[in-house]
Regions:
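C-terminal beta-signal and adjacent terminal beta-strands/loops
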Residues: 63, 551, 592, 647-654, ...
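Transmembrane beta-barrel wall of Gram-negative outer-membrane proteins
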Residues: 207-234, 239-277, 298-322, 364, ...
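Extracytoplasmic beta-strand/coil segments of soluble accessory domains associated
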Residues: 100-144
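Surface-exposed extracellular loop regions of Gram-negative outer-membrane beta-barrel proteins
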Residues: 380-399, 442-467, 475, 488-489, ...
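Membrane-embedded beta-barrel scaffold of Gram-negative outer-membrane proteins
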Residues: 214, 223-225, 320-338, 490, ...
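Short acidic/polar hinge/loop motifs at secondary-structure boundaries
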Residues: 144-172, 191-192
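Short strand-turn segments of transmembrane beta-barrel domains in outer membranes
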Residues: 136, 175, 187, 191-219, ...
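Gram-negative outer-membrane beta-barrel transporters
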Residues: 366, 428, 432, 440, ...
Length: 723
């Protein structure tokens, strides 16, 4: 039977391929870091060739189920996709206060933690920033996107209840036909526990007065099952005026009616009140012990609250078709100061949306499965941006970024997307997956201010006009078709090879279409499209499990933000890489696992930014090498300790490739002790060597090198009581 060990069961992993760094990006210790990280994976592979350590207690991959491919549980062995999984056991060990702490151990994933609960995401991509950059990733909970199509937010992962997740699934590369707009570079899906599944309470204390409580309370009333998930945290922050309070609550239910119809769903509420610390400015300022703790933007804040409700209705027709209907509702309100922009304007945005996911499945025979469905969604959204004080800085910036209101608009949007997928399996070891999705998104925009690039009173800014430009009322429609092809061949019971050709797309986000700048009067944007081809090898031998994937992606109509915070349209970028992962049980007590990523992300068309032609340059915030390695020691059945190495390679911090960040290495130590059957004690020590590093490095034309400093050495002590 095809078996993978637990670390690879819980994630289908990989590593990236790319070109060599430029001469200025090839210092000796960076090459050493890359070699050491690759060696961690190679050591597991080489060691596993010794059968003396082979173990029979590794879970079968057939036992692992995922929902991120077809929206219903299916065995991982039946899915031809690059899916990585964080299991409940791993999530409990990590016990993240920010989802980055968990997700970044998966292949292809590189989430930058900015400040507080903020983040910028990378999945087989650069770390993308800008108002619509979030459109490159589909972020979901229970398979339902966290935000409406066209209304994403770069930080929206804090909307998910990941702290109480049963598992987190990550699809690398364009997702299946079941998912459309935003599933360009990948998808993160937070899967919550089944209703009624167990009860426990966790209390945690940490540095600087950090307090966190987490609870899962299950009720099994026979036919009806309920669960209440709760999470709350209060943290002061290690930088000045950078604390936050966050609360999350989710109610889940499940029942089966007399006619056999199954209902499961829930209601989720989140609230975040955050004091935000901005970038520290100046070359290597993150290394300065005093400066790294300061906050240049003490006025900055972020208030976010969301409500989501859904019900999944599943039944089987007499004709043999399985049907799943999932109506849902979401509401999101966000109020924050844009400390990263000149003048630090305040933005208020909100949207209400309702939709329906419809999918049907039919086993045509033992070897063929046909699936089809449709997604429908309607959204009402709005955005206001205003600036309370005059802009400081250069005379040009002060003249062109006015005090007062910049934008005020409403957008109504609709989405409709039919899809079909066909799967066939042959006895000779081959199987094929064919899919197709068509998606149409329409925006109806209403401007509530004066049209054009004037101040809010109609007066003209000197030096060529105001930075912000408001288009007249208009409607925009985008339609896209995305074909999918996957072929897999079982080389033996324990090894298989996979080949995939897919297309991903996203419509421009509302903020990209209607927050115009400078001379733009109409955002002449097309949908972003990416064509992906990948080849993977996956399997196990004895105590080893492994996966290797090479990929090549070509993206057109990309929208990027340059160092002046100006959108550059119609960009062409290329993304190629290698993802490697391995996990090896050295003996009954020790396990070594790791994921290594090597990638090259480049601009592929002529575009002048800062006087430099970007063609051939690395995309900014795109490390060519990064990954993690974990060594777990389990001396007894009740005690487990994990030492984690997080390695980040160097990368350019601007599109012009004139500034860069050296990268870093960070060690984390996590220990979990089952004191009794019901009581567990955990101690997590992060940044074990107190390394001074940057969570994110950036370069801005308004201030030069700037950084979000990484947090210093810190420890969290937790008690968990199961009942």
């Amino acid at each position: 039977m095809h078996r993978l060990n637990h670390d690879l069961n819980t994630r289908h992993q990989a590593s990236r391929q790319g070109g060599n760094m430029g001469n200025d990006m090839q210092t000796t210790h960076k090459l050493r870091n890359r070699s050491l990280l690759a060696a961690a994976c190679a050591a597991a592979i080489a060691a596993a060739m010794n059968p003396a350590y082979a173990q029979d207690n590794t879970p079968a991959v057939e036992e692992i189920q995922v929902i991120s491919s077809s929206r219903r549980p299916e065995n991982l062995t039946d899915v031809n996709a690059a899916i990585a999984i964080l299991s409940e056991e791993e999530l409990r060990l990590i016990s993240h206060t920010h989802i980055q702490e968990s997700a970044n151990r998966l292949p292809g994933v590189n989430i930058n933690r900015n400040n507080g609960q903020e983040s910028l995401i990378s999945i087989r991509s650069p770390v993308l920033s800008g108002g619509g950059a979030c459109g490159a990733f589909l972020l979901a909970e229970q398979g339902i996107p966290l935000r409406a199509a066209g209304f994403c937010n770069v930080n929206e992962l804090f909307d998910s209840h990941s702290e109480n997740a049963e598992r987190i699934e990550v699809v690398r590369g364009p997702a299946s036909a079941f998912y459309g707009s935003n599933a360009v570079h990948g998808m993160i899906n937070v899967v919550l526990p089944r209703a009624g599944s167990g009860s426990d309470v966790t209390v945690e204390v940490g540095p600087r007065g950090t307090m966190r409580g987490n609870a899962r309370i299950g009720f099994d009333e026979g036919r009806v099952k309920h669960s209440l998930l709760l999470n709350g945290i209060s943290e002061e922050g290690f930088r000045a005026e950078s604390g936050y309070d966050q609360q999350k609550a989710t109610w889940l239910y499940e029942t089966t009616l007399d006619n056999g119809v199954n209902l499961d769903g829930g209601i989720g509420i989140t609230n975040l009140n955050q004091e935000t610390a901005g970038y520290v400015v100046g070359l290597d300022s993150y290394k300065d012990e005093t400066l790294r703790r300061t906050n240049p933007n003490p006025e900055a804040y972020r208030n976010n609250n969301t409500v989501r409700a859904w019900t999944r209705i599943s039944f089987t027709l007499d004709s043999g078709w399985d049907v799943i209907l999932t109506p849902y509702y979401r509401k999101a309100d966000l109020d924050f100061i844009q400390h990263f922009l000149p003048g630090t304007p305040t933005e208020l945005n909100q949207h209400n949306s309702a939709g329906m996911q419809f999918a049907t499945y039919k086993n045509l025979d033992d070897n063929r499965l046909l699936s089809a469905g449709m997604d429908i969604e309607f959204t009402e959204g709005s955005l206001q941006q205003s600036q309370a004080l005059p802009t400081t800085g250069s005379p040009f910036v002060a003249a062109t970024v006015p005090q007062g209101k910049h934008y005020d608009y409403d957008v109504d949007a609709s989405q409709i997307a039919p899809f079909v997928q066909y799967q066939q399996y042959w006895d000779n070891g081959f199987d094929i997956t064919l899919g197709m999705r068509f998606e149409r998104i329409e925006y109806d925009y209403t401007n509530n201010m004066l049209v054009g690039r004037t101040r809010d009173d109609g007066s003209v800014c000197p030096m060529g006009g105001c930075r912000y430009n408001r288009p007249a009322d208009r409607s925009d429609t985008f339609g896209n078709v995305a074909p999918k092809l996957g072929i897999r061949y079982q080389l033996s019971d324990d090894h298989n090879v996979q080949f995939r050709v897919t297309r991903g797309f996203r419509a421009p986000q509302a903020t990209e279409l209607y927050r115009l700048q400078n001379n733009q009067t109409v955002a002449d944007l097309d949908a972003v499209e990416i064509d992906s081809i990948e080849l993977g090898l996956q399997g196990s031998q004895g105590a080893l499990s492994y996966e290797a994937i090479v990929y090549y992606m070509d993206k057109d109509n990309e929208i990027i933000t340059d160092s002046n915070r100006i959108n550059l349209n119609n960009m062409h970028t290329r993304h190629k890489g290698l993802e490697l992962t391995a996990a090896f049980d050295i003996n009954d007590q020790l396990r070594l696992s790791g994921a290594y990523n090597h990638a090259r992300h480049t601009y592929e068309n002529d575009q002048i930014s800062g006087g430099v032609n970007l063609n051939g340059n690395d995309v900014s915030s795109a490390p060519r090498n990064f990954g993690t390695a974990q060594l777990q020691w389990r001396p007894t059945s009740r005690l487990m300790t994990e030492l984690q190495w997080v390695a980040m390679g160097e990368y350019y911090s601007n599109p012009e490739n004139l500034n860069s960040y050296d990268g870093h290495n960070v060690l984390n130590l996590r220990t979990r002790w089952d004191a009794t059957e019901d009581l567990t004690v955990s101690l997590n020590i992060l940044n074990l060597t107190d390394r001074k590093y940057a969570e994110r490095a950036d370069w801005s034309a308004f201030g030069g090198d700037r950084y979000f400093p990484g947090e210093p050495l810190r420890a969290f002590l937790a008690l968990n009581w199961a009942f």
